[in-house]
UniProtKB/Swiss-Prot annotation:
GO terms, biological process: mRNA catabolic process; RNA processing
EC number: 2.7.7.8
Organism superkingdom: Bacteria
Name of the protein described by the UniProt record: Polyribonucleotide nucleotidyltransferase
InterPro entries, alphabetized: ExoRNase_PH_dom1, ExoRNase_PH_dom2, ExoRNase_PH_dom2_sf, KH_dom, KH_dom_type_1, KH_dom_type_1_sf, NA-bd_OB-fold, PNPase
Gene3D superfamilies, alphabetized: GHMP Kinase, N-terminal domain (3.30.230.70), K Homology domain, type 1 (3.30.1370.10), Nucleic acid-binding proteins (2.40.50.140)
Compartments (UniProt record): Cytoplasm
Organism expressing this protein natively: Streptococcus pneumoniae (strain JJA)
Catalytic activity of the protein: RNA(n+1) + phosphate = RNA(n) + a ribonucleoside 5'-diphosphate
C-alpha cells in the first residue's frame, strides 16, 4: 500500500493521519500527528481463536522518553515497565474499544501505541485513542467501530475540548469522554464539585466533538480500509442449549434468587456441578468432549445471565431482594487501628474497605518523571484487592492494571477536597485494603478514605462519598440500578461510578458492555446517584460529624516558614554544611522546596521551635531604624563592629558612639560588650551602619566656666569607662569594612 495522508483541523490544532508507510506487516497501522504530538499505532490479530472464556484484548501505551527530548531515569537509562500514567492511558483506550467486538470473538488482539514525539499542548493520549480505533477500523480485524475520545475542560464557565496545558491547569474539570457516533460508551473524570447539570453538558458537548473525529475516520476507512476477515466466533450447540435449559433452568432460577451472596454462589455452583457431571458422563468417550464441555459451561453462564436480567426487568426484583434504587445496609467506623495516623472502615452490604492514612513531610512526595516536566505528587491513594476478599485463592503480588485504575479513581475523587499545601504542609498517603467485595469496592474505598482523613485531622473541605450505578437494557427498555453488587456488575450493561460531596461531583467513571448509552440514561443515572450519595454522606457525618481538630499523637509534627528564594543557599550552606548542623543540633528533619518553603518536622515540638529560631536567624535581614541589642566583636581605630544577630554585623563609626567627641574607641567599648544600636544605613552592597548615640539623649548645651569659657570636659555616656586621655585620632578610612 502506498503512503496516503489525510488532514483536518480539530480543536484548533492540525490533525494529520498517515497510512501505508510504516509498520506495514501489522493488520492495521497509522501514524497520527496532532499538533506536534506523534503516535504510531499498530493493531495485530492472532490467526486462531484463543482458548479461554474471555476476549484476549491487550492495549498498550508506550511513552518513549526521546519523544520529549529526555533521557530515561535510573541506572539503565532505558524505558522499563510502563509508568502509572501510561497504564491508566492504556486502560482509557481499552475501555471504549472492548465493547466494539462481537460476542463470542476470541482471537487475541493487540493494539500498541508508541508516542514518538510529545507536545504538551496536544493530547498524545487522545491521539493514541484515535489511532487505536483507526488502525483497527482500516485493518481486516472484525472491529465494529470506529470510536473516538476527547478531553473536556471547564474554564470560566466555558466547555473546552482538548484544553491546552495552561487551560487544563485552570480547569474545574478533567474529563475524558469516548463513544461511537451514536452514543457515549466511556467516561473518566475528576471535577471540583461540579453540578450534575454541568457534568451532563460537558459529556454531551464532548460527544459532539467525538462525532467529528469519527466522521474523519470514516472518510479514511472508505479510502484505505481492508475487507474484514471471516473469523470463527464462539457459539454453543443449539440443541444442547435447549436440552439443558429445559432440564435445569428452573433449578438455576431458584439458586440465583437466593439473596445472600455466598449462599447464592454455593446454590448456583451445586446446579452447575450437577449439570457438568451429567454431561461429563454422557460424552466421556465423545471425540469432541472438550468442545461439548466448553459449551455446557457457556450455556450455564448464559442461563444465569438471562435469569438475573429477567428478575430485574420483568419482576423488578434484584437478586438480593432490593428495590432498583435501594442501597445495601451501611456501616462506618473510625479509629479502627491504633498507632496509625488515621483509619476508617466502611461497609456496604458485603463490600468492605479499610482505609489507612499516613502523613509525612513534603520530602516524601512522589517524583513523577514522565514526558511532561518533572513534578512532585503530594497525595497518593493506593488500592489493594486481595483474593481473600471474594473468598478465593489467586495471584498475589504487585498491583495490576485494575488496582492501579481503581486507586487513581479514588485519588481523583478525594484530591478535590484536600487542603492546600499552605494550609496543611504534609504529604498524604491513603491505602485502601478491600477486605470483602460484592461489587463497588472502589467506591467503598472512597468512603473509607473520607473517614480516615477526617479521623486523622486532615482539614478536608467536605466529606466525599461514592456510589456505583448499573444498567439492564434490552434495547427498548432499561432499568437503572443503584449500588450494584457483583452479580449485577457481571451480568449488567453498565458500571457508572459517581463520587462527590453535597455540593457537587468530584469524580466519574463509566464502562459499558453495550455500544453506548443515551443522554436520557445518563441523566437518570446521575439523579439516582446524587440521592444515594447523600444517603451515604448522612452515615459518614453521623459517624464523624467534623474533621478532628488535632492530628493523631503518632503523626509527625510539622511546621513551616517561608524564606526568600535567594536565602535558600544560606540555610543549606556549602555542601549542605549549615542545614546538616541544624539537623544534628536539634534532631529535626528539614525539607526546603525551590519556592523557599521550609518544612521542619519532628515528634518534639521544642526541637521544631529551636530549628525555626536558628533558620529565622540565618535569613533575618537588618532594617533601617530597627534597634538591636548587639555584641561588640571587633574594634578598629575608626569604630567598632557589632553583631546584630547570627552572621549579620554592623559598623558603629566612632562618630556614632557618643554625642561628644572621643579619640579612642576603647574609651567607650571593649570586645564582648553588649550595647544597644540603631541601624541608620544599609548601602547597595548590603553593608550596615549603626549608631549608639542615636539611642542616647542629646546632651544639653555646654555650660560656661567662671571666666566665660566653655568647659572642655566631655559628657560621658553611662557605659563609658574611665581612661587616661590619649592622643586624638581623626583619620577615617576609605572603606569602613
Amino acid at each position: 500500500m502506498a503512503k496516503q495522508v489525510f488532514q483536518t483541523t480539530f480543536a484548533g490544532r492540525e490533525l494529520i493521519v498517515e497510512t501505508g508507510q510504516v509498520a506495514k506487516q501489522a493488520n492495521g497501522s497509522v501514524v497520527v500527528r496532532y499538533g506536534e504530538s506523534t503516535v504510531l499505532t499498530a493493531a495485530v490479530m492472532s490467526k486462531k481463536m484463543a482458548t479461554g472464556d474471555f476476549f484476549p484484548l491487550q492495549v498498550n501505551y508506550e511513552e518513549k522518553m526521546y519523544a520529549a527530548g529526555k533521557f530515561p531515569g535510573g541506572f539503565m537509562k532505558r524505558e522499563g515497565r510502563p509508568s502509572t500514567d501510561a497504564t491508566l492511558t492504556a486502560r482509557l483506550i481499552d475501555r471504549p474499544i472492548r465493547p466494539m467486538f462481537a460476542e463470542g470473538f476470541r482471537n487475541e488482539v493487540q493494539v500498541i501505541n508508541t508516542v514518538l514525539s510529545y507536545d504538551e499542548n496536544a493530547s498524545a493520549p487522545m491521539a493514541a485513542m484515535f489511532g487505536s480505533s483507526l488502525a483497527l477500523s482500516i485493518s481486516d480485524i472484525p472491529f465494529d467501530g470506529p470510536i473516538a475520545g476527547v478531553q473536556v475542560g471547564y474554564v470560566d464557565g466555558q466547555i473546552i475540548i482538548n484544553p491546552s496545558q495552561e487551560q487544563a491547569e485552570q480547569s474545574l474539570l478533567e474529563l475524558t469522554v469516548a463513544g461511537t457516533k451514536h452514543a457515549i460508551n466511556m467516561v473518566e473524570s475528576g471535577a471540583k464539585e461540579l453540578s450534575e447539570e454541568i457534568m451532563l453538558e460537558a459529556l454531551l458537548k464532548g460527544h459532539e466533538a467525538v462525532k467529528e473525529l469519527i466522521a474523519f475516520q470514516e472518510e479514511i476507512v472508505a479510502a484505505v480500509g481492508k475487507e474484514k476477515a471471516e473469523v470463527e466466533l464462539l457459539h454453543v450447540d443449539a440443541e444442547l442449549q435447549a436440552e439443558i435449559i429445559a432440564a435445569y433452568n428452573s433449578d438455576l432460577q431458584k439458586a440465583v434468587q437466593v439473596e445472600e451472596k455466598l449462599a447464592r454462589e454455593a446454590a448456583t455452583q451445586v446446579v452447575k456441578d450437577q449439570v457438568t457431571a451429567v454431561y461429563e458422563e454422557k460424552y466421556a468417550d465423545h471425540e469432541e468432549f472438550d468442545r461439548i464441555m466448553r459449551d455446557v459451561a457457556e450455556i450455564l453462564e448464559q442461563m444465569e445471565h438471562a435469569e438475573v436480567r429477567r428478575l430485574i426487568t420483568e419482576d423488578k426484583v434484584r437478586p438480593d431482594g432490593r428495590k432498583v434504587d435501594e442501597i445495601r445496609p451501611l456501616d462506618a467506623v473510625v479509629d479502627f487501628l491504633p498507632r496509625v495516623h488515621g483509619s476508617g472502615l466502611f461497609t456496604r452490604g458485603q463490600t468492605q474497605a479499610l482505609s489507612v492514612l499516613t502523613l509525612a513531610p513534603m520530602g516524601e512526595t512522589q517524583i513523577i518523571d514522565g514526558l511532561d516536566l518533572e513534578y512532585k505528587k503530594r497525595f497518593m491513594h493506593h488500592y489493594n484487592f486481595p483474593q481473600y476478599s471474594v473468598g478465593e485463592t489467586g495471584r498475589y503480588g504487585a498491583p495490576g492494571r485494575r488496582e492501579i485504575g481503581h486507586g487513581a479513581l479514588g485519588e481523583r475523587a478525594l484530591a478535590q477536597v484536600l487542603p492546600s499545601l499552605e494550609e496543611f504542609p504534609y504529604a498524604i498517603r491513603l491505602v485502601a485494603e478491600v477486605l470483602e467485595s460484592n461489587g463497588s469496592s472502589s467506591q467503598a474505598s472512597i468512603c473509607a478514605g473520607t473517614l480516615a482523613l477526617m479521623a486523622g485531622g486532615v482539614p478536608i473541605k467536605a466529606p466525599v462519598a461514592g456510589i456505583a450505578m448499573g444498567l439492564i437494557s434490552d434495547g427498548n427498555n432499561y432499568t437503572v440500578l443503584t449500588d450494584i453488587q457483583g452479580l449485577e456488575d457481571h451480568f449488567g450493561d453498565m458500571d457508572f461510578k459517581v463520587a462527590g460531596t453535597r455540593d457537587g461531583i468530584t469524580a466519574l467513571q463509566m464502562d459499558i458492555k453495550i455500544q453506548g448509552i443515551t443522554a436520557e440514561i445518563l441523566t437518570e443515572a446521575l439523579a439516582q446517584a446524587k440521592k444515594a450519595r447523600f444517603e451515604i454522606l448522612d452515615v459518614i457525618e453521623a459517624t464523624i460529624p467534623e474533621v478532628r481538630p488535632e492530628l493523631a499523637p503518632t503523626a509527625p509534627k510539622i511546621d513551616t516558614i517561608k524564606i526568600d528564594v535567594d536565602k535558600i543557599k544560606i540555610v543549606i550552606g556549602k555542601g549542605g554544611e549549615t542545614i546538616d548542623k541544624i539537623i544534628a543540633e536539634t534532631g529535626v528533619k528539614i525539607d526546603i522546596d525551590e519556592e523557599g518553603n521550609v518544612s521542619i518536622y519532628s515528634s518534639d515540638q521544642d526541637a521544631i521551635n529551636r530549628a525555626k529560631e536558628i533558620i529565622a536567624g540565618l535569613v533575618r535581614e537588618a532594617k533601617v531604624d530597627e534597634v538591636y541589642r548587639a555584641k561588640v566583636v571587633r574594634i578598629e581605630k575608626f569604630g567598632a563592629f557589632v553583631n546584630l544577630f547570627d552572621k549579620t554585623d554592623a559598623l558603629v563609626h566612632i562618630s556614632e558612639m557618643a554625642w561628644t567627641r572621643t579619640n579612642r574607641v576603647e574609651d567607650l567599648v571593649e570586645i564582648g560588650d553588649e550595647v544597644d544600636v540603631k541601624v541608620i544605613k544599609i548601602d547597595e552592597k548590603g553593608r550596615i551602619d549603626a549608631s549608639m548615640k542615636a539611642l542616647l539623649p542629646r546632651p544639653p548645651k555646654p555650660e560656661h566656666d567662671e571666666k566665660g569659657e566653655k568647659s572642655e570636659r566631655p559628657h560621658r555616656p553611662r557605659h563609658q569607662k574611665d581612661h587616661k586621655p590619649k592622643k586624638e585620632f581623626t583619620e577615617t578610612p576609605k572603606d569602613s569594612e
